[in-house]
Amino acid sequence: MGSFSIWHWLIVLVIVMLVFGTKKLRNIGQDLGGAVKGFKDGMKDGEGKAAADPAQSKELRDSTTIDVEAKEKTRQQ
């Protein structure tokens, strides 16, 4: 009674197929598979970009630094 047998799961599957229909279930499966694939691709891209970012940020920091002499401003009354 604690676990379901294969027959219980088959009955549940048949009921779900009757309620949603096979086309709707297929679309849900495709959407879920596409989301998982997109997530995995995003994780791979994120790891590759994270490794390249420190070197690129140092170059940007060096190229945008402006080196000038500071002038003392006096107050006139």
UniProtKB/Swiss-Prot annotation:
Lineage summary: Bacteria, Pseudomonadati, Pseudomonadota, Betaproteobacteria, Burkholderiales
Protein name: Sec-independent protein translocase protein TatA
A GO biological-process term: protein transport by the Tat complex
Quaternary state and interactors: The Tat system comprises two distinct complexes: a TatABC complex, containing multiple copies of TatA, TatB and TatC subunits, and a separate TatA complex, containing only TatA subunits. Substrates initially bind to the TatABC complex, which probably triggers association of the separate TatA complex to form the active translocon.
Transmembrane annotation, as ranges: 1-21
A cellular component annotation (GO) from this entry: TAT protein transport complex
Family: Belongs to the TatA/E family.
Stored PANTHER family: SEC-INDEPENDENT PROTEIN TRANSLOCASE PROTEIN TATA
GO molecular function: protein transmembrane transporter activity
Function of the protein: Part of the twin-arginine translocation (Tat) system that transports large folded proteins containing a characteristic twin-arginine motif in their signal peptide across membranes. TatA could form the protein-conducting channel of the Tat system.
Membrane-topology annotation of the record: Single-pass membrane protein
Positions of region (Disordered): 46-77
Pfam families associated with the record: TatA_B_E
Keywords carried by this UniProt record: Cell inner membrane, Cell membrane, Membrane, Protein transport, Translocation, Transmembrane, Transmembrane helix, Transport
Protein localization: Cell inner membrane
